A protein has these predicted regions:
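Membrane-embedded alpha-helical bundles that constitute the cytochrome b-like, heme-associated redox core
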Residues: 1-137
Length: 137
């Protein structure tokens, strides 16, 4: 049985990851619709880093919750596996963005764009799966 103290951490996990999703969406909207402004790239970078930091903070809360309740057993279920994938993607995507700015390679730009789209899509799917887990309690 999961202790009440562990369950009490769930809102922090949800808040941090969902905030990260909203911040990343703002960064994507900035890149898509505000390119005519001089400040769009700085805003896009700032929002991307802030969104990744918030998301990773929320994932760290989840890792603590799982390790405190299940020990060293790896998490099971689609929500956990997508969460692991998202944690990798929110590091990979900004990294590719910074590299593509230095190299000016269109292939890297496409990888950065698609990685961002996939990351946001996975986060939306995982938010739904997380909500289904919470509803089952």
């Amino acid at each position: 049985m999961i202790s009440d103290k562990i369950i009490m951490l769930y809102p922090f996990h949800a808040f941090l990851v969902f905030s990260g999703l909203l911040i990343l969406l703002a960064g994507m909207i900035c890149a898509r619709y505000l390119k005519g402004r001089r400040w769009w790239l700085k805003a896009h970078k700032t929002l991307g880093i802030a969104g990744a930091a918030s998301t990773l903070s929320g994932i760290m809360v989840a890792v603590y919750m799982v390790s405190a309740s299940a020990g060293l057993n790896p998490p099971a279920g689609l929500h956990a596996y997508i969460g692991i994938t998202v944690s990798i993607m929110v590091i990979f995507t900004p990294f590719m963005g910074f590299i593509q700015l230095k190299k000016r390679d269109m292939r890297l730009r496409a990888i950065h764009r698609w990685a961002g789209r996939i990351t946001i899509a996975l986060m939306i799917i995982n938010a739904y799966l997380g909500w289904m887990i919470v509803r089952s309690f």
